[in-house]
Structure formats: C-alpha cells, structure tokens
C-alpha cells in the first residue's frame, strides 16, 4: 500500500461506541506500507493488527517512509501477540510523525505505544508485545527511537513495563526476503515526497489539497460529521472532459488507434479488448492503458522508492 492519503475519520458521527475517529488497522503477511499520509485521526495511526486474528497473517510488516500528522489521543500502537510461536514482527523505518492542533499534550512526543494485553490473548494463556525494529524515524523534527515509545496501551496490564519494552526490541530488521523496498529514504525526504505525490488521483481535488496544506502549516483538526461543513469536507467536484470511447470498453479511442498502428493490420479495434493480451504477454490491454495514464505522475526517483 503506497502513496495513499488516509484522512479525517469521523470522530462523533453516531458510532455505537461513541468516539470513533480512527485511522485504520493495518496488518497482513509480508505486507509493505510506504509513503502514505495519515492525517487527522484521534487514534489508530495506525493500529497494527493482533496476531490472534489470524495466525497466518502476523507479519512481517514494513511500515516505511509514512507521514503521520495530527493524531489526537494516540499515535501508533498494537501488534500484540498470543503465543511465543505467533509473534507479530514490524519494521518501522524512516517515518515522519508531526503533532497537530488535535494532539493531546501527553502524547505529542509519542511515536508508538506498545500493546501486550488483549482479552483474546489472555484467553490463550499468553500475552506479549510484538517485536519491533526502529530506525531513522522522526517525531516533531527529532529522532524517534525507543525513548519515544510508551508502554502499555491497556490499563489492565500489570507486568513490568520496562521489561515489556525491552522484550519488544529487535536489533536487526526482520526479513523474509519478500517485502523489502530497494530504497528507503530519510524521514525528511519521505515527508517531502509524500506531501508532493500522495493521493490516489491524477489531479488532487480540493480536499486532498487542503489536507496536504494543513500538514505543511500545522493546522486543521479532527472532525465529527461531514455534514458539519459540506462545502469544506465534501465539496462538489466539477466534471472533467470525458474520453471518446466508441466501443465502451473503458479505453480511449485515440489510444486504441495508436496501439493498433503499432501492432499492424493484424489487430482491429474490435480485437483490442480490455482483458486481452495483444500488447504484452504479461499485462492486459487495460492494465497497460491505465499505467500510461499515470506514467508521468511520479519522477523516476519516487518510482525507485516503490520498487521491490
């Protein structure tokens, strides 16, 4: 998961549990989360999943070169473990944490809160923190090492917190050979690149532009309901110019004619179907078309950071 903007979850919007402005629960096996912008969430910035949810999905996770801004009551936490053979492993490298107007004073310098206690873990007779490798993270412009990690998330945990923290440390990056990025930027460079390129759009809309500017300016905050300010949180977007798509296959006629010319007379427009492999043996025609739409969106340096 890369270059996404995850922003402004709704804090008081009628959830049965009350306050629920949360960023997300991130987990998986051999999963990489890099160059994402997480902004304006009360908690779960993100929350790493618990290993008891699925023993086959306990990591490792690379959490690399992300930007986390304006957490409210908590920043990153989670990754609790329910057995010695089911340990959750997370590599946190080159991430940039920046407190905002909503960040409570007691957590302004908290990069992460360790989590060991959970009801499901206790029921198995074993509960421990995950294992974390920390390197080159920043929080509010300062080095974010283990001194910026608190323990424990649950008030029900009665074990020695210093021992829990010591047991959570990994001396080296946990690897399986499957998830590593070839290039890991400094946290400062990642901050600049995320604010420049993040967002699932060729053109940023008013909301994405506002979120990025708020990160730069140190402004904005948590919201309760979109209806509190529809113009700001859910603006009407002006329609763009649609493509000409005579055969209604999702691909621009001009692009199809260009590709047919390259292929020669052996392929007609009716044969250049979205799910066919006329242009490549590896990618469908539609995949190639969609890739060409965004091929110039990122500079080569940013593309290199996305390559495994």
Could you say what each language-model-derived stretch is?
Residues 13-17, 22-27, 44-55, 74-84, ...:
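Glycine-rich beta-solenoid repeat tracts in large extracellular/virion proteins
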Residues 50, 78-80, 94, 99, ...:
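Active-site proximal loops enriched in glycine and acidic residues that flank catalytic Cys/His/Asp
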Residues 228-308:
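Extracellular calcium-associated, cysteine-rich motifs in secreted modular proteins
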Residues 1-16, 22-48, 55-73, 89-101, ...:
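Right-handed parallel beta-helix
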Residues 97, 101, 106-240:
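Long, ordered, amphipathic alpha-helical scaffolds
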């Amino acid at each position: 998961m890369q270059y996404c903007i995850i922003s402004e979850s709704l804090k008081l919007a009628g959830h049965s549990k009350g306050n629920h402005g949360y960023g997300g629960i991130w987990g998986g096996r051999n999963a990489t989360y890099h160059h994402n912008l997480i902004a304006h969430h009360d908690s779960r910035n993100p929350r790493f999943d618990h290993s008891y949810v699925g023993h086959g999905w306990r990591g490792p996770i690379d959490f690399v070169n992300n930007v986390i801004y304006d957490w409210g009551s908590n920043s990153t936490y989670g990754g609790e473990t329910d057995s010695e053979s089911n340990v959750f492993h997370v590599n946190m490298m080159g991430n940039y944490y920046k407190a905002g107007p909503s960040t409570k004073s007691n957590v302004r310098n908290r990069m992460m809160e360790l989590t060991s206690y959970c009801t499901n873990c206790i029921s198995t007779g074993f509960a421990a923190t995950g294992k974390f490798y920390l390197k080159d993270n920043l929080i509010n412009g300062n080095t974010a090492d283990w001194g910026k990690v608190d323990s424990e998330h649950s008030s029900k945990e009665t074990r020695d917190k210093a021992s829990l923290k010591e047991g959570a440390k990994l001396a080296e990056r946990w690897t399986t050979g499957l998830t590593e990025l070839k290039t890991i930027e400094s946290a400062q460079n990642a901050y600049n690149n995320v604010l420049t390129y993040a967002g699932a759009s060729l053109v940023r809309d008013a909301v994405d532009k506002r979120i990025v500017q708020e990160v730069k300016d140190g402004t904005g905050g948590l919201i309760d309901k979109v209806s509190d300010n529809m113009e700001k949180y859910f603006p009407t977007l002006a329609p763009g110019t649609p493509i000409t798509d005579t055969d209604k296959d999702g691909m621009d006629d001009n692009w199809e004619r260009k590709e047919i010319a390259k292929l020669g007379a052996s392929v007609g427009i009716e044969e250049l179907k979205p799910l066919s492999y006329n242009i490549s043996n590896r990618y469908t025609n539609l995949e190639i078309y969609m890739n060409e739409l965004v091929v110039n969106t990122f500079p080569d340096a940013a593309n290199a950071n996305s390559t495994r």
